[in-house]
Amino acid sequence: MPRPNLEGIDGILSRLIAPHRHKPAFQLALVQRAWRSVLGSAAELKTRKLAFADGVVTAYLNSDSLRHELRAQRERLLEALREELRDELELTDLILK
């Protein structure tokens, strides 16, 4: 009896996701997940909106103190986001508003 062609769940999910990787909504979801992962839920609650276009992440923040702190650590934050998204997206810049 021939053995069935079994594929791992990661391979199946990769094939399902592949056509959507270049869609703006999918890329924004990846950025939002990375933002939450790098900064935590407290900073996420103070983030009004995230936008992503042409490699640039724009974060609209509700907190002036958080904006000031993140601007001081902007390069480190950008590197952490790049590391988090290393296999999925290329980030070129981070704008904090």
Predicted regions: what they are:
Residues 55-62:
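Short, aliphatic-rich beta-strand segments
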